[in-house]
């Protein structure tokens, strides 16, 4: 005789009746019930639905965007992440800035960001977008970092970054989205107009480009004794008026 006999139909019905009459008793989860019910939270369900529906607004201004264009092809296939490029900011929840941002384009970028619905995210792609890149030292029009205009969630350094780096940024952004809560999104503060404010601390300085670059102290011609000693000819652009007359006289 088996030590644990299989209960018959009458015993099972009696046990179910006792559970109904005494609901405080500890319930038993059957195998069928455990295989057909998923326990989750509203945050996880909402974030799971948004992970595969990131619709980007592509804001490409320079050579970095050519690397992003490679993702559209079949070799990389960014559709696997559910990325659907949109042409309208009202239909996008992600804006990808790739390339140099100039002062003249800054108001347009801020306006596009403000027209996007919440929640919205920003990916800064390339050195020119993050810090100004090669134009950060002497350019009078390049913005030294797009984060001075709009808040950035993920940075992709490189000049230009490869498509694999863009995939890595998308994965990191998906992790950030999956950890958000409804309470956190409800308490997001409104974006301020950081591009321009009346209380700025800008100071007027002398212009850098004055047209007198060759007349600076570091660009003056060497003494005539030195040029004669080493036999170095004087470039016409660096020659003074007196030296030019001497050259013309032979």
UniProtKB/Swiss-Prot annotation:
<keyword id="KW-0479">Metal-binding</keyword>
<feature type="binding site">
    <location>
        <position position="63"/>
    </location>
    <ligand>
        <name>[4Fe-4S] cluster</name>
    </ligand>
</feature>
<dbReference type="GO" id="GO:0045271">
    <property type="term" value="C:respiratory chain complex I"/>
</dbReference>
<dbReference type="GO" id="GO:0009060">
    <property type="term" value="P:aerobic respiration"/>
</dbReference>
<feature type="binding site">
    <location>
        <position position="64"/>
    </location>
    <ligand>
        <name>[4Fe-4S] cluster</name>
    </ligand>
</feature>
<comment type="function">
    <text>NDH-1 shuttles electrons from an unknown electron donor, via FMN and iron-sulfur (Fe-S) centers, to quinones in the respiratory and/or the photosynthetic chain. The immediate electron acceptor for the enzyme in this species is believed to be plastoquinone. Couples the redox reaction to proton translocation, and thus conserves the redox energy in a proton gradient. Cyanobacterial NDH-1 also plays a role in inorganic carbon-concentration.</text>
</comment>
<keyword id="KW-0618">Plastoquinone</keyword>
<dbReference type="GO" id="GO:0005506">
    <property type="term" value="F:iron ion binding"/>
</dbReference>
<keyword id="KW-0472">Membrane</keyword>
<protein>
    <recommendedName>
        <fullName>NAD(P)H-quinone oxidoreductase subunit K</fullName>
        <ecNumber>7.1.1.-</ecNumber>
    </recommendedName>
</protein>
<dbReference type="InterPro" id="IPR006137">
    <property type="entry name" value="NADH_UbQ_OxRdtase-like_20kDa"/>
</dbReference>
<keyword id="KW-0520">NAD</keyword>
<keyword id="KW-0813">Transport</keyword>
<dbReference type="GO" id="GO:0019684">
    <property type="term" value="P:photosynthesis, light reaction"/>
</dbReference>
<dbReference type="GO" id="GO:0015990">
    <property type="term" value="P:electron transport coupled proton transport"/>
</dbReference>
<feature type="binding site">
    <location>
        <position position="159"/>
    </location>
    <ligand>
        <name>[4Fe-4S] cluster</name>
    </ligand>
</feature>
<keyword id="KW-0004">4Fe-4S</keyword>
<dbReference type="GO" id="GO:0048038">
    <property type="term" value="F:quinone binding"/>
</dbReference>
<comment type="subunit">
    <text>NDH-1 can be composed of about 15 different subunits; different subcomplexes with different compositions have been identified which probably have different functions.</text>
</comment>
<comment type="similarity">
    <text>Belongs to the complex I 20 kDa subunit family.</text>
</comment>
<dbReference type="GO" id="GO:0008137">
    <property type="term" value="F:NADH dehydrogenase (ubiquinone) activity"/>
</dbReference>
<keyword id="KW-0874">Quinone</keyword>
<dbReference type="Pfam" id="PF01058">
    <property type="entry name" value="Oxidored_q6"/>
</dbReference>
<dbReference type="GO" id="GO:0051539">
    <property type="term" value="F:4 iron, 4 sulfur cluster binding"/>
</dbReference>
<dbReference type="GO" id="GO:0031676">
    <property type="term" value="C:plasma membrane-derived thylakoid membrane"/>
</dbReference>
<keyword id="KW-0521">NADP</keyword>
<keyword id="KW-0793">Thylakoid</keyword>
<dbReference type="InterPro" id="IPR006138">
    <property type="entry name" value="NADH_UQ_OxRdtase_20Kd_su"/>
</dbReference>
<feature type="binding site">
    <location>
        <position position="128"/>
    </location>
    <ligand>
        <name>[4Fe-4S] cluster</name>
    </ligand>
</feature>
<keyword id="KW-0408">Iron</keyword>
<keyword id="KW-1278">Translocase</keyword>
<keyword id="KW-0411">Iron-sulfur</keyword>
